[in-house]
């Protein structure tokens, strides 16, 4: 629930920065990324609906509501950081049991039923690591990845900080990393007894060690260098 998230976000206002600190009022508002389309007669869209869409823009489905990924292509710095992180993880995991994927890659997060018509959350994380290969199919991933990494962009900060935090926690994503490319900061959330526990605020010079995927380490000096 958002009430559980607010104290954590407040404690890390340096990470979120001043422009994101209105997240408290956001809980009562629709985000600007929500696609203005009429809902189906039953009130929410499902993955079955999602599969039948032919849209010019990329969208995600979060608890039955449609959100655009961004108004435009991700910024250069976002893509540069994404490429650096993905390449490091791919090289480390090559030949191992776990696999890493980058967007666009559908991650379906079922609540109870795994039927397409019952799934109402389909997201495209910037990067995700899946160690249980039974969750992988031709459509992407069905079930919670072990590790999800999101890189904030100016158009989607609300979605990452509120909506995705909630669905990742509820779905059992064991570890969730958030990278702020312009603040050059990094925070991790580790799932403990069904609730996310935040790390300290990391920045350039720190080494991130994954708690969910053995052996994964990420040097933030490498991630944040040469971004200009």
PLM region descriptions:
Residues 10-228:
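Gly/Pro/Ser/Thr-rich low-complexity, intrinsically disordered segments predominantly at protein N-termini
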Residues 3-4, 32:
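Residue-identity detector for glycine
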